[in-house]
Amino acid sequence: MSNAMILEDASRFWIPTPMVSRLRDRIEQCLQCGDTGCVIVGEARLGKTLAIRRILSELSNRSGERIHAFYTHYGQRDTETVRAVFAKIARALGAEVGRQTADKLLEWITLHLADAAQANSTRQVALLIDEAQLLSAKQLNAFAEIYNELVDMKINCSIFFVA
């Protein structure tokens, strides 16, 4: 591949930096200690989204087993409902979302995450939510509902908000 072709598609250009390593280490520390998650904050256009997407497949539990981590992002919408949050998460997990109620979407999400958590001995799964600063307080409570449902199912879930 010529240098011109490499530069033509810069989207695949990636330089792992010490900051990305520290970010991965911090997220894994949360996962391995069983933390419910954390908030990752940084200035705009620093590369948080790219870094998060790159490390998704590298996350592991304290036994070194892979943890399924799911990513979604939010933007400003005219509808700031809990159902909108659940619909966005369900789409990110592969669901075809129609006119389901918030309760049906929540049920689908928790069952999907619970299934994914069975892949490791710690029954653990992670959600990474990008552009979290755009969510209202009411919408943020939707994540507490997901977390609580998973706890009832004996599933360990860590939710990371990137803002």
What are these regions (language model features)?
Residues 54-55, 141-144:
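Short, glycine/charged-enriched secondary-structure capping and boundary segments
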Residues 46, 73-77, 133:
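Short histidine/acidic/glycine/proline-rich micro-motifs that form metal-
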Residues 1-41:
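Walker A/P-loop-proximal flanking segment of P-loop NTPase domains
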Residues 37-39, 69, 124-126:
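Residue-level preference for the first positions of well-ordered beta-strands
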